[in-house]
Amino acid sequence: MHILIVHFGLEGVSEEQYEGQVESVAPAFAGLPGLVSKTWLADPETNTYGGVYLWRSREAMEAYKEGEIYKGMLANPYLKDVSARDFAVFEGPSRVTRGLLAEAAA
């Protein structure tokens, strides 16, 4: 398992407009191979938005980062200062603390 955390600011688009855009693209994420779950993030007070992705493997995450959806996000002129960081998951203790509920439901 791997987690990818992405965050960025919005520029030239309102939070409401952004939310409408992500509502329309969410189904594309649901079909990504190896994606267990994506949680969409928003902090309007600091203009910070993004997502937390749980992947079945590092390879699935890397394939996403080489794909059109990720490249499109990086090229989006309304998203500024995009930052991404990935982490391996300690699966045993994460299951104990219910950190992998989505994976268990799959």
Give the label of every model feature segment.
Residues 1-48, 58-66, 77-106:
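Short S/T/G/P-rich N-terminal loop/turn motif that feeds into the first structured element of a domain
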Residues 71-76:
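A common structural junction motif
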